[in-house]
Amino acid sequence: MSLKIPGLADMHVHLRQDNMLKAVVPTVAEGGVSVAYVMPNLIPPITTVDACLQYKKEIEQLDSKTTYLMSLYLSPETTPEVIYEAAKKGIRGVKSYPKGATTNSESGVESYEPFYPTFAAMQETGMILNIHGEVPPSKDNTVFTAEPKFLPTLLDLHQRFPKLKIVLEHCTTADAVEAVKACGESVAGTITAHHLYLTQKDWQDDPYCFCKPVAKTERDRRALIEAATSKNPKFFFGSDSAPHPRSSKLKTPPAAGVFTQPFAASYLAEVFDKEGRLDALKDFACIFGRKFYCIPLDFKESNIVLKKESFRVPESVANDLVPFHPNEVLQWHCSWE
């Protein structure tokens, strides 16, 4: 049995920098991805148009075939003037991180109100606001409540800027799914591959399953699967593949991030097949993200072929990076046509 679909549109990737960048970029195409939206949380974060374009150049020198879309890191430097310049240069969006909630988020946001003029400029130019939807860490919040407590802010931003395209990144709860559904067509949500597999018990026992936002309950996992397989265009694929050195994953606490990039299409096909919804995979992983980001659906790039042919996920790839579910057998093998 085989399935031929366009190369995936992965609307949330972490490629890192320096030697890690060189190791990770080749795994994007290996995972069946032909369009990748790149996150800006480097050290230092990508806050200027020039830095963003230089980063894009570095990536494309390593892989000229994949289409890489770029983003800025929301900061006090992200003025309306910067937005106008970024839009002219083809930068697609701005990523918002809650201060201190995840990898390289120390420069993140504590309040959105100072950025209202920036959001107005983004609404005007069609740039996308990508939100890591958790409230900042505090004594009143836990990793389990951080996303639900953020959702009123999402609804408020949507009401204030109804034409601003907003993506609630890496949804992890049933509440997040319902919040995205409750908003108009300008609001969407990405869903990762690994959150379709994981619940709380998985990451508590395995550092390679630990990420931010953390995986939640079985009820939440089922809500994500139902959203991903529903053919609802408000939900599309964003892997949030986040590589870290093995040493960083084995420390206490482990670095937050799951590395799915090399086998992205295979991980997705596994879940969609088990749900009897392979018919929905193309929409979720190839079509809806492209449409939301206004990427032409001409599919000039090659297709991928998913063949029901078992293989074992290697223990490590790309300079000793440990992929999601190492040594486990997957039933769907991905190759380029």
Swiss-Prot record:
UniProt-listed InterPro entries: Amidohydro-rel (IPR006680), DHOdimr (IPR004721), Dihydroorotase_CS (IPR002195), Metal_Hydrolase (IPR032466)
GO molecular function terms noted in the UniProt entry: dihydroorotase activity; metal ion binding
Cofactor: Zn(2+)
Top-level EC class: hydrolase
Keywords (A to Z) from UniProt: Hydrolase, Metal-binding, Pyrimidine biosynthesis, Zinc
EC number per UniProt: 3.5.2.3
Catalytic function, reaction form: (S)-dihydroorotate + H2O = N-carbamoyl-L-aspartate + H(+)
Signal peptide from the UniProt entry: none
Metal-binding listed as a keyword: yes
Modified residues (N6-carboxylysine): 95
Textual note on the cofactor: Binds 2 Zn(2+) ions per subunit.
GO CC term (a single one): nucleus
PROSITE patterns (alphabetical): DIHYDROOROTASE_2
Database matches in Gene3D superfamilies: Metal-dependent hydrolases (3.20.20.140)
Any one Gene Ontology BP term: pyrimidine nucleotide biosynthetic process
Similarity annotation: Belongs to the metallo-dependent hydrolases superfamily. DHOase family. Class II DHOase subfamily.
HAMAP family assigned to the protein according to its UniProt record, in alphabetical order: PyrC_classII
Record-given protein name: Probable dihydroorotase
Lineage: Eukaryota, Fungi, Dikarya, Ascomycota, Taphrinomycotina
